[in-house]
Amino acid sequence: MGRDTIADIITSIRNAHMDKKGTVRIASTNMTENIVRILLREGFIENVRKHRENQKNFLVSTLRHRRNRKGTSRTILNLKRISRPGLRIYSNYQKIPRILGGMGIVILSTSRGVMTDREARLEGIGGEILCYIW
């Protein structure tokens, strides 16, 4: 039985966010790099760097926190895995769901790579719905 690396990323980020940790260490694969790149571009994480330890590559990402007078407070971050190895969920570009009326994002795996729902609608392609982030 294989590992679900996307669920591992989502769980790691969610746990670090709930525990108010600043950084998350994620195993590096092509899929995880693409998802983290989207999270970085959309502003859900602050910084990403590659780290090599014992012949294995990792991504160390810094979570984004707001600063206010009382100190740092965390931004509201919710992640939900949709398509999973036991039940794949596909959608064409017209039926890609909108999260919170467009405030959240949907990450899709398409024939042209991993992209957000906005990019998929602009290009007119659908794909496998990996996760929701809001």
From Swiss-Prot:
One of its GO terms (biological process) is translation. GO terms for cellular component: chloroplast; ribonucleoprotein complex; ribosome. The keyword Calcium does not apply. It holds the Pfam family Ribosomal_S8. InterPro entries: Ribosomal_uS8, Ribosomal_uS8_CS, Ribosomal_uS8_sf. The keyword RNA-binding applies. Its main location: plastid. It comes from the Eukaryota. GO terms for molecular function: rRNA binding; structural constituent of ribosome. Coiled coil: none annotated. Keywords: Chloroplast, Plastid, Ribonucleoprotein, Ribosomal protein, RNA-binding, rRNA-binding. It is found in: Plastid, Chloroplast. Part of the 30S ribosomal subunit. One of the primary rRNA binding proteins, it binds directly to 16S rRNA central domain where it helps coordinate assembly of the platform of the 30S subunit. HAMAP family: Ribosomal_uS8_B. Belongs to the universal ribosomal protein uS8 family. This is Small ribosomal subunit protein uS8c. It comes from Piper cenocladum. The lineage of its organism: Eukaryota, Viridiplantae, Streptophyta, Embryophyta, Tracheophyta.
